[in-house]
Swiss-Prot record:
Its EC number is 2.7.7.7. Belongs to the DNA polymerase type-C family. DnaE2 subfamily. This is Error-prone DNA polymerase. It is found in: Cytoplasm. The gene is dnaE2. The keyword Transmembrane does not apply. SUPFAM superfamilies: PHP domain-like. It comes from the Bacteria. Keywords: Cytoplasm, DNA damage, DNA repair, DNA replication, DNA-directed DNA polymerase, Nucleotidyltransferase, Transferase. Its main location: cytoplasm. One of its GO terms (cellular component) is cytoplasm.
């Protein structure tokens, strides 16, 4: 039958990257077009190219010609209707013009919007003059059905004049009651303008079954329920990709033939895009290659004062030769320049990821991992056979990274530099809220269901939540809600900005990819995300934020002040026994990477005693090694409970440092090369497939080559198959060795500071919030258990940030909390207090309020936080004086006023004080809340953490504490790990799926949780395996009328 059907190319198709309009993914549209036998498909999202790379990749798989285009609504003024225009790129020049037009429209409007007028096509001004008539683009007028015939004819004549020989008028027939009138109007306009008519489907769905979702998106877009949308809903489901048989019955043959004529003229492919690196960093008299060589060897003299070893020197030369062959010098120099700027400003930074495999990056100061210390594999970073740009990730202090970002913008300009986009997609709770509102569900039910839903919950749990909220799961509304939520999950909602992935080009970046405004002032983003850039092999530079770098710089500065001389990162002793003793004891709250529950459970078993042990420690607690079954054999071998064996010398070479067990991706690559006969490029392709095998089954295509290569070199079939199973495990997230090596340096440095400079480390952690695994309350409690004296925030002594304060006769300083912990206090108010205090001490609260010019809100916040205690007494007195002081007028700011006598108000109880501390500062320096509740808890036989830690293995036990962390790792098969805190320390608990099923509410809702279970203590790892849970949060109400506001860290 296909032989007698007319050919057809859909020239107006919108995906779900026309946010809240299209109801299908780009890949779904491409696949469906291929199934229907279309000659081509044009993706024409509204003023956007955000979905074209996904469509391009799928079209390449389907061998379907993809036309790159975009649709626009041009605002013609108050007296004229908008003009709906579709533009299609004929060639590379046309594509660049299209991308620039999108950039122009997006740049004029707030995030997520655009503004274009007919004048932007007819007579664009200034730098955009070359866009006049949109050269090398084909233009199709796509009028709505209700547009008056004369208005349509007027628009057609205008378009014919602007794009002579490149313009059409589109006819869209969707089985509307006015199709005949619309067709007549189009024919009239075509006759009046001389434009040919072309068939347009204006598809927004790949199948008609998406119509309910299409209606739901319209409701979400307009902020109403589906029942209230009326004519804003499509009248039927015809805006899907229709069969050619159906199209032939609707459209004139000539209109269908025109689609093929247009498709033949549009020959552009995204594969034609060529990226050019910035080149202005190279000074006169140098080529990029000579300048990179010069800077590399200058850096080598600093990195290796006694000279490079022959192996390192050979590695540098090998890398420089390959970089030169692939013409990547400008990329390395761009990153070198950015890192150089950061260092010149005193901003701590460090490269990580596969770049740490590079000796050149180490010499340039981009990375901190000495290639002589590691088992680097340069092919993990750059491969000639891969023929794609390397990826250099550089971490900067999170509180100063914006300075680096603005430097890049200033150096290269907004026309040449922009951040990578991140596609924000629907997640469970946002899906439930939006679809529930669209269906008209009561807001109370929506809130209850959304709050109860967790990221791992499926349709069954949602229906159970509906039942708990009084909605019949079998009802039509419940079923629709569940089905729509399931379909909408993962749909793109809007574009956001990447944490720091920059695209920088030699010429106009807007001719490569459209640029639009970000929500944050002073930022702009391209319309593609990192996966899009990778798919097209386009370069990006990752300027990332890392909180621990802020902590390290601050802690080193504070420690240097205490010691009376500067302390630098490289001066930290590398093999400190006390530091490793602390690490082995899992005493790592607050340190980098090894502070999580899983890492702390592993530390007593792995017992790191040197740097490379930390590299393994950082990497081994990852889904990849866990799923691949690498962890148990490594631990057994490390603990001497299993022989260390190697099937052959090539395997020994790759795995000797990890006791014969593959932990890192680089090791798999090396085995593939040395033991299975892979080329370095093939090995890297294997590595890349590891991350994609669950999605695409890509790793399977290497099974025969890997297993066959091992068998051909006399390795056993058992070993070959076992190795491949381990490789499959890397399909889950795992660290490359180079990445783990970079992070291990920071893990050790932060551990050393915690061990030897605990006061400076705590102050730095508090001043670098928000970051890390633990809230300030847990960090302070842990520090105090280690003997650190912590003083409260006080307006007479505190600055905005925490500081070190000496005390007469004390061997070590105390940590004075900063005013930044006071909830509701602005930084400018705290700075004003500091400045006024320098001039002369405050006489009382009123004196401080007048001289610092504090508003009533600031005074109330300080009183609530007990930061006025030295001036005014306890909280109630302070609140009274704050209220009285707020009446002072600005003109009396410097006058001395005699206040009326403050009434004798009773001091709050200890419990009230503790509760108020948590509400106003987020922590307490008084007794722990559970110390106050201990008599009630002891009556129920709940033991403290200190007592539990003395229990033998498999003893029945009871614990109670404030929930500080809930975690559900994907590798834990549904188990949730809970951390409680009492007055003596943390308690780790394990909650199995069957108990979660029975006591979900207690587990997820309790602030104070009691756990009955069995204590486990093996190899220094201790936890309570839960058998019953009790929500004891009501006990906290005894501390004060308002209870205790303590937030846990849930499932982050």
């Amino acid at each position: 039958m296909s032989a007698i059907l007319p050919g057809y190319a859909e020239l107006h198709c919108q995906s779900n990257f026309s946010f809240l309009q299209g109801a299908s993914h780009p890949e779904e549209l491409v696949t469906r077009a291929g199934e229907l036998g279309y000659a081509a498909l044009a993706l024409t999202d509204e003023c956007s190219l955000a979905g074209v790379v996904r469509a391009h990749v799928e079209a390449r798989e389907q061998k379907l010609p993809l036309i790159i285009g975009s649709s626009f609504t041009l605002q013609a003024g108050a007296d004229a209707p908008p003009l709906d225009l579709t533009l299609l790129a004929q060639n590379r020049e046309g594509y660049g013009n299209l991308a620039e037009l999108i950039t122009l429209g997006r740049g004029r409007a707030a995030k997520g919007q655009y503004l274009l007028t007919p004048a932007d096509i007819e007579a664009p001004a200034g730098d955009n003059a070359h866009l006049r008539g949109m050269p090398d683009c084909l233009a199709i007028l796509a009028p709505p059905p209700g547009l008056a015939a004369e208005r349509l004819a007027e628009q057609a004549r205008w378009l014919a004049a602007q794009c002579p020989g490149r313009a059409w008028i589109g006819l869209t027939l969707l089985h509307h009651c006015r199709d005949d009138l619309h067709r007549a109007a189009v024919e009239h306009a075509a006759h009046a303008s001389g434009l040919p008519i072309v068939a347009l489907g204006q598809a927004q769905m790949h199948r008609r079954s998406r119509k309910p979702l299409h209606d739901t998106l319209a409701a979400i877009r307009t902020g109403r329920s589906v029942g209230q949308c009326g004519y804003d809903l499509a009248a039927n489901a015809e805006r899907h990709l229709r069969s050619r048989l159906r199209l032939a019955s609707l459209y004139p043959a000539q209109a269908l033939a025109q689609t093929l004529a247009i498709a033949r003229r549009c020959t552009f492919s995204l594969d034609e895009l060529q990226y050019e690196y910035p080149d202005e960093i190279v000074p006169a008299g140098h080529t990029p290659a000579s300048y990179l060589r010069q800077q590399t060897y200058l850096g080598a003299r600093q990195r290796f004062p006694e000279g490079m070893t022959p192996a390192v020197a050979a590695q540098v030369e090998k890398e420089l030769a390959l970089i030169n062959e692939l013409r990547y010098e400008a990329y390395f120099l761009t990153v070198y320049d950015i890192v150089g700027y950061a260092r010149s400003q005193g901003i701590l930074c460090q490269g990580r990821g596969s770049a740490a495999n590079s000796a050149v990056c180490y010499c340039l100061g981009i990375t901190a991992v000495d290639p002589a210390r590691g088992n680097t594999l340069f092919e993990r970073f750059i491969s000639k056979e891969r023929n794609e740009p390397p990826d250099i990730d550089v971490d900067f202090e999170h509180q100063r990274r914006e300075e680096v970002i603005q430097y890049i913008y200033e150096k290269y300009g907004r026309q040449r530099a922009a951040l990578t986009a991140v596609v924000i997609s629907y997640r469970p709770r946002s899906v439930l809220r939006d679809t529930g509102r669209a269906l008209g569900v009561d807001n109370g039910i929506i809130d209850a269901v959304a709050r109860a839903h967790q990221w791992w919950d499926g349709k069954k749990e949602m229906l159970r939540s509906l039942a708990a909220c009084g909605l019949d799961p079998a009802s039509r509304v419940a079923r629709q809600w569940a089905e729509l939520a399931e379909t909408l999950m993962g749909f793109p909602r809007h574009l956001s900005q990447h944490p720091g992935g920059f695209v920088i080009s030699r010429g106009k970046l807007s001719r490569l990819v459209p640029i639009e405004n970000a929500a944050m002032p002073g930022r702009s983003v391209v319309q593609w995300d990192k996966d899009d850039l990778d798919a097209l092999r386009l370069l990006k530079v990752d300027v990332l934020a890392l909180g621990m770098l802020s902590v390290l710089r601050r802690a080193l500065a504070l420690a240097g002040q205490r010691r009376g001389r500067p302390l630098a990162l490289h001066e930290i002793p590398p093999d400190d026994d006390a530091t490793y003793d602390m690490i082995c004891a899992a005493d790592t709250i607050g340190v980098f990477q090894i502070e999580s529950r899983a890492q702390m459970s592993m530390l007593p078993r792995l017992r790191p005693r040197q740097y490379y042990d930390l590299v393994v420690q950082v990497a081994i607690v990852r889904p990849g090694p866990i799923q691949g079954g690498m962890v148990p054999p490594y631990l057994r071998r490390r603990q001497g409970r299993e022989d260390i064996t190697y099937p052959g010398p090539a395997v020994r070479k790759a795995l000797a440092r990890t006791l014969g067990v593959p932990i890192f991706q680089e090791q798999v690559m090396q085995i593939a090369v040395d033991a299975a006969g892979f080329t370095p490029g093939e090995a890297d392709a294997l590595r890349r497939s590891m991350a994609a095998w669950r999605r695409k089954g890509g790793v399977d295509k290497f099974r025969a080559q890997l297993v066959g290569g091992l068998l051909a070199r006399n390795y056993t079939a058992d070993f070959a198959q076992a190795l491949f199973r381990q490789i499959e495990g890397f399909g889950e997230y795992g660290f490359p060795e180079s990445h783990a090596a970079s992070f291990a340096l920071l893990a050790y440095a932060s551990s050393w500071l915690k061990c030897h400079e605990p006061e400076a480390f705590l102050a730095a952690l508090l001043n670098s919030q928000p970051m890390g695994f633990y809230a300030p309350a847990q960090l302070v409690q842990d520090a105090r258990r280690h003997g650190v004296r912590v003083l409260p925030a006080d307006v007479l002594y505190s600055g905005w940030e925490a500081s070190l304060q000496d005390a007469p006769g004390a061997a070590r300083p105390a940590v004075r909390l900063g005013l930044n912990l006071v909830k509701g206090l602005r930084e400018d108010s705290a700075r004003a207090i500091e400045q006024a205090r320098v001039r002369r001490p405050f006489a009382d609260t009123a004196d401080m309020a007048r001289r610092a010019g504090l508003p009533r809100q600031a005074l109330d916040a300080l009183a609530a936080a007990d930061a006025l205690r030295t001036l005014a007494g306890h909280r109630r007195l302070a609140s009274w004086q704050a209220a009285a002081s707020a009446q002072s007028r600005d003109l009396l700011r410097e006058a001395v006023i005699v206040e009326t006598e403050t009434p004798a108000l009773p001091a709050p109880s200890e419990g009230q004080t503790v509760a108020a501390d948590y509400r106003s500062v987020g922590l307490t320096l008084g007794r722990h809340p559970l110390a106050l509740l201990r008599p009630q808890l002891a009556a129920r036989n709940f033991q403290t953490a200190a007592v539990l830690n003395t229990y033998p293995n498999r003893r029945l036990a009871r614990a109670c504490g404030i929930v500080t962390v809930r975690q559900r790792p994907q590798t834990a098969k549904g188990t949730i790990f809970v951390t409680l805190e009492d007055e003596t320390g943390p308690i780790n608990a394990v909650v199995r799926p069957e108990l979660i099923e029975r006591q979900r509410r207690e587990l997820l809702d309790a602030t104070l949780l009691g756990i009955y279970g069995t204590w486990q203590s093996v190899d220094g790892v201790r936890h309570l395996v839960a058998q019953r849970l009790v929500d004891l949060s009501s006990l906290l109400g005894q501390l004060s009328q308002d209870g205790l506001a303590a937030a846990s860290r849930n499932f982050h």
